[in-house]
């Protein structure tokens, strides 16, 4: 009887450890960082891929000849970002926490910043709408059960809709992205 009990226990423990790690079905949260505040939702597309949708405010600062004073502003931003979490199985096999998609990821961050509802310390300020595509690398780790932090970087392309603001032609440029955020998951 002892041999059967030991054998059944061993088989059950092997089956429990053989499960593949997967991203969460849905992760809803808020984050803040040095340059803004955002609300996000990550929805599972496959075991390793999640689609992050985000709405928030990016912060900015402008000064110079065209501005009578230094301008600090918050502009709305809408982001779609497919994320590939590539090390969930490795983290799971080492008994590290993978809840709320805690792991390393690569992504393509696609953001649109319109000239709507710009909040600033100067009246009647407007920004030029833009869209950006930034391949990125990042990590997310949990701090307790509901808090997390994220860090990442990437380089990509930004297209500026300058003609809509009265300029003679639209512009495009290379852009870098570095982010460090702390957040709360519901």
Give the residues covered by each predicted segment.
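Bacterial Sec-dependent N-terminal signal peptides
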Residues: 1-24, 182-186
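Short loop/turn motifs that connect adjacent beta-strands in outer-membrane beta-barrel proteins
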Residues: 19-25, 48, 87-103, 143-147
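Start-of-domain marker
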Residues: 20-73
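Residues that define the transmembrane beta-barrel architecture of outer-membrane proteins
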Residues: 22-28, 33-35, 72-78, 127-133, ...
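Transmembrane beta-strands of outer-membrane beta-barrel proteins
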Residues: 26-30, 47, 51-55, 78-80, ...
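Transmembrane beta-strands of outer-membrane beta-barrel pores
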Residues: 32-36, 55-61, 84-86, 110-116, ...
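Flexible, solvent-exposed loop segments that connect beta-strands
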Residues: 61-72, 112-127, 160-172
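Outer-membrane beta-barrel "beta-signal"
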Residues: 76-93, 174-186
């Amino acid at each position: 009887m002892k041999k059967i009990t030991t054998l059944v226990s061993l088989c059950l423990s092997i089956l429990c450890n053989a499960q593949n790690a997967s991203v969460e079905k849905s992760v809803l949260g808020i984050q803040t960082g040095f340059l803004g505040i955002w609300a996000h939702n990550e929805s599972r597309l496959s075991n390793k891929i999640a689609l992050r949708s985000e709405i928030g405010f990016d912060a900015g600062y402008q000064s110079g000849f065209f501005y009578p004073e230094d301008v600090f502003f918050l502009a709305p931003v809408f982001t779609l970002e497919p994320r590939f979490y590539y090390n969930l199985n490795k983290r799971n096999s080492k008994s590290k926490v993978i809840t709320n998609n805690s792991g390393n990821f690569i992504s393509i961050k696609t953001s649109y910043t319109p000239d709507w509802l710009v909040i600033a310390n100067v009246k009647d300020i407007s920004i030029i709408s833009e869209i950006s595509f930034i391949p990125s690398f990042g990590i997310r780790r949990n701090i307790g059960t509901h808090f997390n932090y994220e860090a990442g970087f990437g380089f990509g392309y930004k297209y500026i809709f300058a003609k809509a603001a009265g300029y003679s032609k639209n512009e495009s440029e290379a852009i870098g992205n570095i982010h460090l955020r702390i957040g709360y998951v519901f």
